[in-house]
């Protein structure tokens, strides 16, 4: 059994799996790119089976519908496509019915469509009455501002009904898909295995080792989860990814009496483009974090991981852990989103 190192905060899924590897899979999220076919591997019906099994294993599911033909399109064989929006309610319904059961099994669904898909306007106008249990997102690229639908896209982003994600590719040119929370990029049928370092529970000098040991734990766990035996997910050999994040940054700053602004100045200085002279405690934290990420990256490369970090941690994970003074750890520092679009 993989031993949990000190100061590593695991997700509930990983914690349950460590107690009982036969109970359910420890991965948090997965993605599925739907091909333009009702039947066959990776087709529409296959995506429903995939979604059902993933939700019943407590995973969030991101579904990319961008390859589906627009509504009203003929396939040349006498069949007319109903379009991606017509299937959206199916995924919402699956989430509503399967999101709970037995042990803690809350699921989540995020639907994706390319901003330049012919049915994008219909997608933007989908009512919550039709898909109450699904979140919507739009894949965008550098040509977004030239879209004839840019005003409506901006409007939907501002009212919170639509999220944006960049089209992404790996070094081999393979398409990567955003997961439910949009913090992890995966190959289709890939999975997201997460754990976090608790910055609030360590001293500054302990940060580098926490990163190194935490990444070692996660990389070793990656090959033991049984995900490859599920029949629906990519195997660990095909899906070379983990997600190591942090919780308790604000706790650490408070414990060390460092203002967030001073920490930012120190981080910029350490990264080589800051102009301000940081305070000594802030500079020490920034240096320790940089060393920690560097040491963790070395571990990840040694395990042939292609991606290894996550920015936004699992929020509910942080509420189960405490800092050095006994206070609940904060998930992250999130300034108010007031950026103009």
Model-identified regions with their sequence ranges:
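Extended catalytic cores of very large enzyme megasubunits
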Residues: 1-341
């Amino acid at each position: 059994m993989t031993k949990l190192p000190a100061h590593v905060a695991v997700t509930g899924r990983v914690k349950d799996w460590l107690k009982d590897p036969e109970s359910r899979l420890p991965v948090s999220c997965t993605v599925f790119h739907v091909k333009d076919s009702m039947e066959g591997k990776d087709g529409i019906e296959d995506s429903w089976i995939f979604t059902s099994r993933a939700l019943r294993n407590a995973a969030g599911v991101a579904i990319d519908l961008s390859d589906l033909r627009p509504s009203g399109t003929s396939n040349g064989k006498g069949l007319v496509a109903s379009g991606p929006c017509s299937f959206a309610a199916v995924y919402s319904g699956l989430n509503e019915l399967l999101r709970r059961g037995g042990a803690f099994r809350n699921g989540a669904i995020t639907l994706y469509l390319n901003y330049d898909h012919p049915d994008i306007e219909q997608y933007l106008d989908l009512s919550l009455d039709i898909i109450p249990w699904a979140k919507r997102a739009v894949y965008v690229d550098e040509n977004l501002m030239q879209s004839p639908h840019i005003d409506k896209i901006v409007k939907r982003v501002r009212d919170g009904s639509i999220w944006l994600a960049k089209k992404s590719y790996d070094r081999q040119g393979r398409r990567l898909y955003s997961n439910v929370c949009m913090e992890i990029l995966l190959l289709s049928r890939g999975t997201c295995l997460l754990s976090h370092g608790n910055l609030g529970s360590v001293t500054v000098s302990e940060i580098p080792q926490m990163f190194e040991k935490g990444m070692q734990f996660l990389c070793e766990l990656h090959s033991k989860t049984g995900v490859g035996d599920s029949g629906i997910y990519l195997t660990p050999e095909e899906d070379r990814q983990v997600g190591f994040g942090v919780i308790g940054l604000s706790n650490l700053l408070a414990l060390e009496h460092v203002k967030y602004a001073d920490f930012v100045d120190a981080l910029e200085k350490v990264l080589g483009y800051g102009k301000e002279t940081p305070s000594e405690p802030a500079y020490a934290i920034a240096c320790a974090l940089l060393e920690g990420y560097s040491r963790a990256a070395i571990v990840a490369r040694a395990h042939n991981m292609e991606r290894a970090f996550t920015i936004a941690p699992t929020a509910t994970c942080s509420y189960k852990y405490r800092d050095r003074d006994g206070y609940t750890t904060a998930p992250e520092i999130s300034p108010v989103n007031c950026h103009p679009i």
